[in-house]
A protein has these predicted regions:
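Function-dense linear segments that define catalytic or interfacial modules
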Residues: 1, 5, 89-176, 181-191
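Conserved, charged catalytic cores of large soluble enzymes
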Residues: 4-107, 181-206
Length: 206
């Protein structure tokens, strides 16, 4: 569904998949995106070659962010061979990524693709949005915008049509929203600041 349904008619869903580092299939996932090692039958090309000619050429786990989940076992000195191979793969292909979940958060392995939200509940949902700081003139306006945007996200979460009953139950239980901040560089440029923290920005954010 995520590969084909367009959000708002213009944006494809972001996909995320992860696996525990101790899973029996972990070595297969580690190398799943080595497309240069996967030949196309009847040709001398690999899938990576085909992707260079046609970005939309189908490839395993294409359009999905993948990660390995590391927990207390890794933290206590185990799974070093897997971790080092993960580092090697990430340097070669950019994936898999790394997900670290320790102690009382060890089961929070579920994420949305950009990982603003973490959860341990199957079928969890979240409603995300961003405030463009560059379009706001005063700290008072910023406060009002954050307040209204948070309300908007809550209302959207409540009103959203959900695919099945379990999602609705988890939504009522957790009610997750995430309000991000963008446009900070433009905000700084408009005020002739360098791209760094300053007292004015600190005052706005506090």
């Amino acid at each position: 569904i995520g590969r084909n349904v367009m959000q708002g008619g213009s944006r494809r869903s972001a996909l995320y998949g992860s696996m525990d580092a101790g899973h029996g299939d972990i070595w297969e996932l580690l190398h799943a995106k080595n497309w240069s090692d996967i030949p196309i039958e009847g040709t001398e090309l690999s899938i990576a070659d085909a992707k260079k000619f046609n970005f939309n050429y189908h490839a395993p786990l294409d359009m999905m962010n993948i990660s390995l989940n590391y927990g207390d076992e890794w933290l206590n000195g185990g799974q070093d061979d897997i971790f080092m191979e993960n580092c090697k793969q990430a340097l070669m292909t950019g994936e898999p990524g790394f997900s670290f979940n320790f102690g009382d958060k060890k089961n929070e392995t579920l994420r949305n693709a950009c990982t603003e939200i973490t959860s341990e509940d199957d079928s969890d949902v979240c409603n995300l949005g961003s405030v463009n700081l560059a379009n706001i003139e005063t700290p008072e306006d910023f406060k009002d915008v954050v307040h209204l945007a948070s309300k908007f996200l809550v209302c959207g979460l409540i009103r959203a049509h959900l695919p099945y009953e379990k999602v609705e139950k988890i939504r009522q239980q957790n009610s997750r929203i995430g309000l991000g901040l963008m446009g900070m560089h433009e905000w700084l440029l408009k005020r002739s600041y360098k791209y760094e923290m300053n007292r004015d920005l600190m005052r706005w954010l506090n």
